[in-house]
Structures are given as C-alpha cells and as structure tokens.
Amino acid sequence: MYIDITHYLTVSALMFTIGIAGIFLNRKNVIIILMSIELILLSVNINFVAFSAFLHDLVGQIFALFVLTVAAAEAAIGLAILVVFFRNRGSIAVEDVNVMKG
C-alpha cells in the first residue's frame, strides 16, 4: 500500500479538529487546554513535513523543528506557571486564573 500526501493531510486534519474541539469543549482544565494546543501544533508539523517530503524541499522540515522547539519551551513555561499557580491558589481551574486579571 502506498501512503501519499492525502493520508498525512487527513491524519493532520483529524488531529487539528480534535485539538480545536478539546479547547472549545473543555474550558475548565488548563492542562487539557495546553495539551490541545500541543496537539494542534503537532498537526501543523505533520503538514509541514508532509508538504516538505512531497515537494522535495527541506524548508518545511526545518520549520517543523523550529516549531517543535518553540512548543517544547511553551509547554515547559506553561507547566511551570501552573505549578506556581497551584502552590499559591490550590487550584488550576480557569475561573481562578481569570481572577488574576486585576
């Protein structure tokens, strides 16, 4: 069986849709929102790599590595903020984060 670009784009679109649904359907838990954002970024990376392989160009793969680096930094900083917030407030609910707006 030959796997062409439509298979990659279908999987990527499905992952992107699941990530968007995770953000819109679950607005209570910050960790699930962060995981949904990571799923969206991963689906975008699959698109970059698929088009890069299809067009025989390395720019998409280099950009995917850049996005992975930024996503890892975003996840580390987001989880560190959540740990500090949980230590101070005792909860990581989104409603408690909205109280911090001032």
UniProtKB/Swiss-Prot annotation:
The keyword Membrane applies. It is a multi-pass membrane protein. One of its GO terms (molecular function) is NADH:ubiquinone reductase (non-electrogenic) activity. It is an enzyme of class 7 (translocase). It comes from the Bacteria. Its EC number is 7.1.1.-. It is found in: Cell inner membrane. The chain crosses the membrane at residues 5-25, 31-51, 66-86. GO terms for biological process: ATP synthesis coupled electron transport. Its main location: membrane. It catalyses: a quinone + NADH + 5 H(+)(in) = a quinol + NAD(+) + 4 H(+)(out). Keywords: Cell inner membrane, Cell membrane, Membrane, NAD, Quinone, Translocase, Transmembrane, Transmembrane helix, Transport, Ubiquinone. One of its GO terms (cellular component) is NADH dehydrogenase complex. Belongs to the complex I subunit 4L family. HAMAP family: NDH1_NuoK. NDH-1 shuttles electrons from NADH, via FMN and iron-sulfur (Fe-S) centers, to quinones in the respiratory chain. The immediate electron acceptor for the enzyme in this species is believed to be ubiquinone. Couples the redox reaction to proton translocation (for every two electrons transferred, four hydrogen ions are translocated across the cytoplasmic membrane), and thus conserves the redox energy in a proton gradient. This is NADH-quinone oxidoreductase subunit K. It comes from Bartonella tribocorum (strain CIP 105476 / IBS 506).
